[in-house]
């Protein structure tokens, strides 16, 4: 931006002249182009305004492409070796096949390289993005820069992206590596991800489309983009195509088809052409309506006159070309363009160099553009193809041909055809009037009537044909001519050059690129054009530099200093925060800034400044009798009256220049004399009125000149007044800053006082003034001034914030009338209070508008006292420094600080240069390492998990009778489908080990099995099975210690090989006889429930008992091996063996203990008989042994013996005893122990009550109580009325009111509290604390408990507590002051109590347990959801037979189920329930609607079912929003199903009318899950309703669940919920665990409680902070092992403080960021938001946990949102740990 532009008027009612601007970017000539009047006109031409490309041959821009074309470059070469390496390793045959596959073509050297950090993409995500996405993203950015569009400015715009794509090599590479598939790979490798990634990164709101039309894809994309623009669907289009050759598959296909040349070269039109060379790269063009482009000052590169797309229909083969189709599509494009074929000068052909394709295409093009067009033989049409230069880019080929055609039109030349030696003899070149150039050809000179035109053809092997017609822009030559008239390097006017980068380390490279370009083009460029390009048409990133330069050599030298990080006074640098700085505020300072030649330079060189001076000259002449112009030219005398007037003139003149460069201010303030200019610039006065005030007052000052003096003293105004005391003749005139003020008064008095204070060590500096400004000595001038101004001033309301330094309230809106200026003259200047108000209002950027800075230091000091935020205070001019450069430097400082200067609006017609260097990329390799073995080869070396054994690759050991099986075991290939945890470690079930033995041996018999050490699944380990004719052994070792010599191999299990002729002891069992002698019928779930009770939380296999009978020593169970058809099992045997070992361990259920099998005497299987899915398992105790030993037999349903497991012995695990482990660790209730009281109570200077009812009788009592304690208070009906800025220690107490309707009470109170929090956070009032008072008895207020807990988690800095009080007329000050960090406090017996989870105690036997009767009906809301259907299935297995499933959605008519909806999973679930014997009614009733209760009653009467005995309310929706974002609509939508639904059920089924009333709530509210404000409120209401019904004698209970694995919130695809659970200190549970917990609660009658909290606390690390206080009594942790001399990070042993602590924390936090994002620590920018570095929601949770475990301090769920950068986090933890 240049300081020499002409003037602009202030944004005020000031008088002035119109702006004078430089000429606009040409675009005025539209001859030959249709410019429609209507935006939606379908006839509109489309302009190409930007292009970018990256191709082989090191082509990285259209300019470098043109140079490459001119030299007939051929970029063909060999495939980089690493590309196909994963395929070479996948199969032994692949190496030979790849050797036969063409490995030559046109390749990018750095296809794996990408600048992920620039786009804030984490390395983890970057490597999962197809290189095509990365390439397209970078090239699209370059194309926008080439178009002169700053990409960030498109955010939210109707900009579309159309990208052609046809290759999915990377997707195949990644997605076929199944064990390593990751969530990011979906969009990361999809075709749609290529345009969508661009739209996402740039925040574009227009269409985003990927097109696959094979090799025509990118030209088809351009066609659709053009159509969308013409139809008005989009304003701007990014169109192009991309191709990457990463796998051998398609190359092999094309080899087989004979389409590829053996040497990988393209030879279009050449006799030797025998196929094409595949190529990779990307091309992008930017399209806009021509009329809009001209209006926006864009450079029109060419006009896209017409385009067409078609198909070649049915040919000899789908890949065979069709000349007629190619001809027709060309004619269609010409018709669209409305130009004749003979006007086309050049055709860019598809020309794939195939023997059939080239002649076919050339003949078709000749028919259209050659001889068939009727053109003269002397005017042939030139034809060419870019493919021999850069290869056939397939999906990117069309757009690259288009870019070449645009370059041909712009240069008026056709480059020579590469790789053309002998013309193809199959083409009639002598007759067709098409000419492929051998040398550079210059096209005929175009004219306005006959502009140059070109056509582009592109075809796909699938049959798509496309064509485009281009025309040279008629204004191009005019533009070039006018650009040449712009002054170049010798223009002396200074300019501002802006460079920036998203990270600090990039700035040097950006500066280096610009320096090199300037050096190479010094003689031909205009520095002004470079300035406007950088300011208006480039993105402005976080790290900013601004250079003030007045010549190209000056700029080059400054850029060199930037590159070297050398100091330079005209180089400004800064980094901005994540949001734009608020401001700027212009400060007009007062008397004292003057110097003799202060305005001379500006008057001579700035038209804007000169205009101000000439406007003021007549007034100054008339009013004070001297010439301002003459004074500027000769020098300003040191006379107070002249200084006053000239200072005002300088203020307005500098402001005029500054507004041209940086735009208008956001606010203004004047200091003393400066208030006059502030009034003018704000619009409160015209410039004439401002001049009258200053001139007439200056004239009066002449009476007092020489009678006064002023001195700056380094003490505060308050101290100065105390020191002055009763001394006369001296007053405090200016309150400048907290440590300084200005004294004014009589000359002698000032001198005496100054001398005395200096002797006392106080700094005193005399001010250049001989008038006693701002003292009572001026009172005699008051009346004359008032009279002289009365009637002359007509003050207005300012048009921007105007602060006062004359009024006690700096925000006073008093009009600037005559009385105001009297006050301004006499009263002290309150600069300090005005600056404090500016800081309080959030302004952080301030500019001192003066000829020399005199208040900057004071302003910096005051701002520093008011805020810890970064602050900018900059001068506009400095004495004896170049004025224009100084003002530009101020603009540069504002920009670098982060003020949003709209440069393009300041000078919209400024010329610009697209050749200015674009973004410099900092590439790093990102390429996903995949498993280099195929699925088949993996099976050769590892076990098959679905075989449910550990047999890997079989190796016969030569020279021995031994056989070895070896495998690699890890979590991903565990040989069982479920989970089998033991003390937190996943172990291989004994059944799998036994099956492994049986599978390895030919005689299916093993004996003397010893199960010695469990085989642990994770971490990964090697497993070997060795056997000979006598023994078989399983051994294992961790992968990292797998050498045989180091003794790390464990013997896990051994056995002897059984004899070949061993058979079961019996062939058949009489099952009917067994049933008769086993009289005790057990529940089908008996074994599972028992095992759960002793600590087995999950099963390795999905077997299920369907019939179970027993006696004291014997059991018979009918078992289904796989009732739900779970995958992961090739047969049923191992699942049934697992059932056998599990069920037989329950024979000793009367002595409960977790028992594991330790040995087996013999296992024998009848291998001739296939194992059915359903078997009977017979277990009997072996009485002759002291151990727990059983014999087990598996039989078919007819009694045929299938297997015997004889003498299986069990032993209890060391330290295990019966304690109902599973449910005691799972089922809890909330108890309320006394709260700990702090020693340093909170102090409140004021308490503000907020309540809808200000007549609430409690208020009078509370205020009386506070009056007695001398604490002030106030009452407010709305949060917006709170006095947040008036008190430093404010307590806000919300008193919710009760309304007639319970739902209205709940929603109103929650909305009120949300509004309070939003108001306080918006005001950034961190010293305010919020409390809520309830009596705990009002049902509608119970929702507030859940909301309060979420607020505590999200805003712990302002949350006090929700307090349930006993005495509603006594303010609970003790709890408010002495209990800290509590979300909810309950006062009972006068004691503040806090919530803690404790195990649910057993209840008395008199309570009714939960039972399901076949004769009753049960109702489930949310019944068609996954949770509801799972509950329904469990209830049916427990005896329920009649179910009502309520849901908001209706199922299709049952008559259509069998035909159309058999794959509907909901319908399948219902049919499964019916197969189990249940009658299911699905009722489409939205239970939250007002009429739901009556509708449900009516439906129940109609169905005529047995009475409803139990209700489960499981309906609900989730809409996560932070409290700051919650709206009333969202809150009500989430609360309705929970609260209205529950109340409707409460109405239909009143208390004591049911066997049970179960409400599904959530534990998320207790643990403060962020974002769940609405959901938590609804769930807390359910808890309150259960409490209310229980109080009325009902068997109601609220179950506060953790997530159910795989259901509801437990289905988070990206693992966010699992990570959040872990962060909060708990885990999810399986549905089986949920039902066992429910059964446990029901079996105790709920323990007499109205709720049960069903969670499992995870085991914490030794030094890990407790994730939430509510877990205090149930959390367990591992012992912390610390080596001697070591201390945990963040522990009190590390005695650091100050800068040492800050550096330690920065290192720790950077390490955690590095670990989370997989980024190097030296690449982390501590000022960049972690989200902008690519940290998503799941990573954020993991980062919090890493941080918490490293620092050993709690890290709240919203801390990362409030402290978004490393810088913020360091500051936060420094304060916390220092405290």
Swiss-Prot record:
The modification O-(pantetheine 4'-phosphoryl)serine is found at residue 1737. It is an enzyme of class 2 (transferase). Residues 586-883 are annotated as: Malonyl-CoA:ACP transacylase (MAT) domain. Disruption phenotype: Loses the ability to produce yanuthones D and E. Residues 31-40 have a biased composition (Basic and acidic residues). Its EC number is 2.3.1.165. This is 6-methylsalicylic acid synthase. The gene is yanA.
